[in-house]
Amino acid sequence: MAACTSSLVSLLLLLLLLLLLLVAGEATAEAALNFTRQDFPGGLRRRHICLPGFRDADSITFPRDIESLTCGTHMCLDPRGSHTSVTQCHGECHRRNVIESQSRFRRTYEGATGEDGRTPSIWDTFTHSGRMADNSTGDRAAAGYHKYKEDVKLMSDTGLEAYRFSISWSRLIPRGRGPINPKGLEYYNDLIDKLVKRGEICDCSMGIEIHVTLYHLDFPQALQDEYNGWLSPRIIEDFTAYADVCFREFGDLVRHWTTVGEPNVLSIAGYDSGVIPPCRCSPPFGTSCAAGDSTVEPYFAAHNSILAHASAVRLYWDKYQAKQKGVVGTNIYSFWPYPLSRSCADIDAVQRVLDFTIGWILDPLVYGDYPEIMKKQAGSRIPSFTKEQSELIRGSADFIGINHYKSLYVSDGSNREKAGLRDYNADMAAHFRGFGQFDKEDSLNDTERVEYLSSYMGGTLAALRNGANVKGYFVWSFLDVFELFAGYHSPFGLHHVDFEDPSLPRQPKLSAQWYSKFLRSEIGINIEKMVSPDEHEHAYYQ
């Protein structure tokens, strides 16, 4: 009982801290907070938290201590144990305001899927098989392949100082390995050059700062056909060779690299539920797949993605970092689970969910191995790291990026029927806080999105004033794009794209105008409501 009480006290402290960071605005406050971008000491970069001594696993309880601070953030972690400052970690241009100006991976923006030597990816196969709800394919998307010059100017006009995008492996290296596609190389080089030349909006020489993700769910179909993609250890060599090309060709101007975007989504959605390509699953976890084993394959896909990440990181450190002065890390999907009740069982279920979703990827990068509960529950179904592999992956990141999308209520499921339950034995109910508005008129006059951004920034400032080492964040997203599950019917961008018009014109929404004024310090933010600890506890334990 004492252990349960201690856990409950710790959890309540975590919930309070998360509250300050994430929701900022659902109850009452003693005084309103007014601030502008100058109140953010590191600017509005997508929140980077720098901690010394990443390799000294005994000095920090990671990811557990950090999870309470950083849902929805990027963290900068120094893997070599030195007391690296924020500026050292990210270069002289770090202290600037930043917005994420692109969707999660290039296919949703670029389009031109069959042009200039690009070969199919697994997402092309998926959409062309009629799997999208609106029967769209994304072949055109937001036409970024042809309209990127216009979009870079729009970024500059808006006041953006950083741009985050991923590279299409199938466009750069059409067969997945071997010869580079000259047209693909030309496209990415010109995009990067155009971003860098927009230096007049920045107080340093780097123009619009570039953050590149090497891989985000868009695997070359050629390699998928050859050896089942992430299920095979052969991916490690091919991914490292692909990363080598990117570091060599673009590293003179790119200082921030993410290896694999959301490897836990890759594993769960691609190989457990099978709702995204390569659509592998088995009942009862997924029922619409032609092949797969949901009890084994997600673990192997994640395992190989961790090893591929570490291999690429070590390559960058050994071959490029000294000259290029960049940083490299990974990025994971994150939601925050709340216990449905005060019971010890539900509180323990929260930790299991964290271990099986976040710790699954982060524990190997810190400790060199999976969480103990995962190894116990999954047994022989989860691969083991050799001693050499453990040394390779431990500390293999300059930063860890965390994408936060939603929060969940969690209850214990360990005493219920096992059919249909995951290894962590917890039932979850999702509580979304998105800001997509689907009617065109409402989308353009998106007051709810403005309120959301204002509240989120207010929560960030509150966390800063309460001691959290928060440095900024990217806003999602710059343009309406082809979305993973909703196709062209989920306008989450700050700028509207008219997908009914063949020319795909862009039009700033109210949120784009508001954010641009905020970036230029023409307006501030007034936070009139904060959630008190008592009200927060009542909200989640009523």
From Swiss-Prot:
Keyword Cytoplasm: no
GO biological process, any: carbohydrate metabolic process
A GO molecular function held by the record: beta-D-fucosidase activity
InterPro entries per the UniProt record, alphabetical: Glyco_hydro_1, Glycoside_hydrolase_SF
Enzyme Commission identifier(s): 3.2.1.21
Coiled-coil region(s): none
Enzyme class (EC, first level): hydrolase
Pfam families: Glyco_hydro_1 (PF00232)
Keyword Aminoacyl-tRNA synthetase: no
SUPFAM superfamilies: (Trans)glycosidases
Recorded catalytic activity of this chain's protein: Hydrolysis of terminal, non-reducing beta-D-glucosyl residues with release of beta-D-glucose
Protein name, entry field: Putative beta-glucosidase 23
Gene that encodes it: BGLU23
